[in-house]
Amino acid sequence: MATNAKPVYKRILLKLSGEALQGTEGFGIDASILDRMAQEIKELVELGIQVGVVIGGGNLFRGAGLAKAGMNRVVGDHMGMLATVMNGLAMRDALHRAYVNARLMSAIPLNGVCDNYSWAEAISLLRNNRVVILSAGTGNPFFTTDSAACLRGIEIEADVVLKATKVDGVFTADPAKDPSATMYDQLTYSEVLDKELKVMDLAAFTLARDHKLPIRVFNMNKPGALRRVVMGEKEGTLITE
């Protein structure tokens, strides 16, 4: 397939799961993975792409899990939001060490730690080629960081949400459990809903669908995959109308 000389996206929203940062450790943040991700984001900035990043917090804390053990779900979700801020701080630090200008914003005020989220300020920073890391989810309990990614993607007028996962794309079945599972190159929103494919939770997915925000699922553990996605090469699964 011919490679495009120019990126196919001008502004992206990159959704990283907290689990993606933990590497093989099973918990916490793997510094080498963090640095590799920072380098891959740096490549995009050098291509002139405006990058917004939403990070999950599952490597540090899962509110839903503790809610099952009896903790109040709202409290658990607030702790989960703080976990995403911790990941955001780590990512901002990794980007700064890679000589990339980055700003961390939080949906819940944390004065002295990071900036409060402002839609206008985020867009202004993106236009000036700053990487904007958007943490603390939506700022509300009961919403996942996938919902935050779609919400922020719509707000900052991103061309696409790039959902970085541990698998190469969206499959007919879980490839870890079913070796015969095949990957889709492209799907429509309605196909995902009809086939009940696990792309993201329903609240997040329907938000993207209603605002015609394309989603591309790809494997962040595959070196160079992010660059291939933005250059329009065959990588991952694209979900559109």
From Swiss-Prot:
Pathway linked to the protein: Pyrimidine metabolism; CTP biosynthesis via de novo pathway; UDP from UMP (UMPK route): step 1/1
Protein name in the entry: Uridylate kinase
Catalyzed reactions per annotation: UMP + ATP = UDP + ADP
Physiological role: Catalyzes the reversible phosphorylation of UMP to UDP.
Binding sites annotated in the UniProt record for UMP: 57, 77, 138-145
PANTHER family per UniProt: URIDYLATE KINASE (PTHR42833), URIDYLATE KINASE PUMPKIN, CHLOROPLASTIC (PTHR42833:SF4)
Keyword field contains Transferase: yes
Organism expressing this protein natively: Salmonella typhimurium (strain LT2 / SGSC1412 / ATCC 700720)
